[in-house]
């Protein structure tokens, strides 16, 4: 992403760029062109059969011979069914990660890439146990599904015709499939299962719409923070539900490593705290989550009830992590090999957080430099953002993404709990939170995060 006013662009196609010099894409053909090729081939085969031309190979003879060398008429060919699975439209341009030199790439939407496929499993806070299902929805991606726009041919069962149709299948399919050998599948970190769907368009994903997040994204697209958040492309309907069309932040990375960092000193709204006090609701599921981390954490009364309230659980959750001490906490990490690390619930001290980032970046000094520069750009932009000063930002994350080609990016994500302040009120985002002042500690956390990475860079 760039500072405000700098055009954002789409990531370079996978297989291009510094990681694979000299590689070129296979020729691109639209579905319409492929259909014409297919129909022309079928017509040629049918015409040859109707004219009684001999087969070039494998012509059978009675008893192994054709009398007098005369050709035997070939059976009428069975034309395979052509199935076009999707549109041939080119994906719209959307912002992407920087190139090897750290420059944000210009818009380029001339190539249709494989859409990613969402996993139906949820790793809460990148965890394998759903300990933090109340946290906001974040996504990672690691493998792609079959491209929309593929052309599939159902081959004839006639052995004699099989080779003809196999040639056509190859002719039609290879231009579409060959540029995209490496595929990834979605992994959802934190949040509720089923929040995301594949968009079916390169560079985009769908997230289940909520009124608060829709409100925020519309306003963010007109704010200086536009280049620091996923590009928003409107709302679409899928299976009777509304979804937000968002930029796929992993598009253009090769085997991305991803870290989700939840920002702020709290992940609950003040109004949630008030409502919980007025109408307390005991949660057995949260009691079990608390017990799984620390059997001594519940009080005697909570042990007797075998339940806790949500505010009690969330305040405890933030107290055992770095949220209250540093203004952020690490939710989870997905490595390039697809493995997820989620054991950060008690990662609290600056030293512990530093070790986690060292492990995440694996000593890549170039990635560290780019992360640090990007965080400083984001902080500068937040400090002049009218949207930021007039909103309480709760449950939002910074998403860190890098790959082995030293591409790296950081974005603000998740605005489902971001709420506007009463007219005339603004936040400092660094002042300590006291109930009633609505301070979230976002910039406090970002200052500490930048300090930790700056210390790493000096080593």
Swiss-Prot record:
Where is this gene product found?
Cytoplasm, Cytoskeleton
Q: Name one Pfam family in it.
A: IPK
GO BP terms? actin cytoskeleton organization; cellular response to calcium ion; dendritic spine maintenance; inositol metabolic process; inositol phosphate biosynthetic process; modification of postsynaptic actin cytoskeleton; phosphatidylinositol phosphate biosynthetic process; positive regulation of dendritic spine morphogenesis
Stretches for region Calmodulin-binding: 285-293
Q: What class of enzyme is it?
A: transferase
Major localization listed first in the record, in broad terms:
cytoplasm
- Coiled-coil stretches: none
This entry's Enzyme Commission designation comes to 2.7.1.127
By what means is the activity of this protein regulated?
Answer: Activated by calcium/calmodulin.
Q: Where does ATP bind?
A: 195, 207, 247-249, 260, 334, 414
Kindly list the residue ranges recorded as spanning the membrane: none
One GO MF term, please? calmodulin binding
Residues with the modification Omega-N-methylarginine, per the entry, are 35, 55, 62
Gene3D superfamilies referenced in this protein's UniProt entry, alphabetically = Inositol polyphosphate kinase
* SUPFAM superfamilies per UniProt: SAICAR synthase-like (SSF56104)
Q: Sites of the modification Phosphoserine?
A: 135, 195
Q: Does the keyword Glycosyltransferase apply?
A: no
Residue ranges with Low complexity bias: 116-132
Q: What's a GO cellular component annotated to this UniProt protein?
A: dendritic spine
The residues the record assigns to binding substrate are 262, 283, 310-317, 417
Q: Which UniProt keywords apply?
A: ATP-binding, Calmodulin-binding, Cytoplasm, Cytoskeleton, Kinase, Methylation, Nucleotide-binding, Phosphoprotein, Transferase
* Family to which this protein belongs: Belongs to the inositol phosphokinase (IPK) family.
UniProt function note: Catalyzes the phosphorylation of 1D-myo-inositol 1,4,5-trisphosphate (InsP3) into 1D-myo-inositol 1,3,4,5-tetrakisphosphate and participates to the regulation of calcium homeostasis.
Matching PANTHER family: INOSITOL POLYPHOSPHATE KINASE, INOSITOL-TRISPHOSPHATE 3-KINASE A
Write down what this protein is called.
Inositol-trisphosphate 3-kinase A
Source species: Rattus norvegicus (Rat)
Q: Which gene encodes it?
A: Itpka
